[in-house]
């Protein structure tokens, strides 16, 4: 399959053009499982950025990866009905659920819906990519409360460490440049995520690979207070 034809198909998936996607799949069923032979790199990224969903296409991504990134349950269901694999990994080891957990834009209901759908058909909420990152780590880092809740409801481990030994709670208490972390909205999301993780069994005494407890990773007195109280205030 020509790369240009595959990229055009991905554009249709991202745009949510179900009729065109259906026609392409009927003509070329392999599109449902084809892994992208190209993708964003440090040298060339612009051509693989989809502004509609604020997400890059990476080598190894399937159409389902991009439907998940678009938070499109209808498109994900269409692709699955044509044989797409909800456990497909790209070259970085990321699965569609990893992309669904990213909070690149504010569509909480749609994001939660696609996460719930993927888990319902067999996506593994604790799957890790090549860097040891699970979907919950992504959702926490991007301050996506709806995604965090959907993942926890679907069986994500609130104490799962990444390769650095950081648990979701370690990540939740740190400042992140994503999603406008300095805004009032982001701070509220952060507080609610911390409270939710604590409710679901996360422990402030857990240590990362360097022996640092969550308390020590907290970047402000406000966050340390939340940890002590065990709730958002």
Give the ranges of each region predicted by the language model.
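Conserved ankyrin/ankyrin-like repeat signature
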Residues: 20, 74-75, 113-114, 146-147, ...
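Eukaryotic tandem repeat interaction scaffolds
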Residues: 112-113, 124-164
